[in-house]
């Protein structure tokens, strides 16, 4: 992919010592060169306007949280085999289909009047300097969960405000087995402790 991409791609790697998402994201942030970081997970299929939507939604002093539609196992197999080459919110096999509808005017209304949503680390964007200012992800988060929510708390506490992007930045999440969640309780407690600070 690095050889065919029209934009520079740098693969950041670390040894597989369990689920250490916070640590690898920090390595990627440190290696990044741009002023603005759009963070996605590797199991997403991005709608063609995804990057453009994020750039239009970016504001100084803010970070962006988006969402994703969930694709069933059957539809994922069809996509990966090449049987299906494009996705639509109306297709059978897409859950949370309201998350994959792109209506730019509704995005403005939702941001202005809609509720603040819980962050999804699979679809977020930040100014690099803001991430450095709050010292990036807390690498004490081991295993699945809550590292993204805890980061958002620290960003908010540093007067960097959340902008919820809905009806733009469309992404489809491929089906896969869920990560081991044995560390979830300690991660949740660590997140709750950050709220009290």
Regions found by a protein language model. Give the residues of each.
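The conserved acidic donor/metal-binding loop of glycosyltransferases
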Residues: 41-45
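A short, conserved alpha-helix in the catalytic core of glycosyltransferases
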Residues: 119, 123-135, 141-161, 166-167
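Short, flexible, basic/aromatic active-site loop/helix in glycosyltransferases
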Residues: 84-116
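Conserved donor NDP-sugar-binding/catalytic core segment of glycosyltransferases
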Residues: 49-86
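Glycine-rich, basic loop-to-helix element that forms the pyrophosphate-binding segment
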Residues: 15-32, 49
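Short aromatic/hydrophobic "clamp" motif used to bind/position activated sugar donors
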Residues: 37
């Amino acid at each position: 992919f690095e050889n065919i991409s029209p934009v520079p791609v740098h693969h950041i790697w670390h040894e597989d010592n369990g689920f250490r998402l916070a640590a690898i994201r920090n390595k990627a942030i440190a290696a990044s060169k741009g002023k603005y970081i759009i963070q996605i997970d590797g199991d997403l299929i991005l709608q063609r306007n995804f990057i453009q939507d994020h750039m239009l939604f970016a504001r100084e002093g803010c970070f962006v949280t988006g969402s994703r539609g969930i694709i069933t196992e059957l539809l994922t197999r069809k996509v990966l085999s090449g049987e299906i080459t494009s996705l639509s919110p109306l297709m059978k096999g897409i859950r949370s289909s309201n998350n994959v509808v792109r209506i730019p005017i509704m995005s403005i209304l939702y941001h202005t009047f809609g509720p603040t949503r819980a962050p999804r680390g699979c679809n977020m964007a930040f100014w690099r300097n803001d991430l450095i200012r709050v010292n990036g992800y807390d690498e004490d988060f081991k295993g699945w969960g809550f590292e993204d929510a805890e980061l958002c708390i620290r960003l908010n506490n540093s007067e960097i405000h959340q902008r919820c992007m809905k009806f733009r930045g469309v992404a489809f999440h491929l089906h896969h087995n869920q990560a081991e969640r044995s560390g979830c309780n300690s991660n949740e407690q660590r997140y709750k402790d950050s709220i009290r600070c």
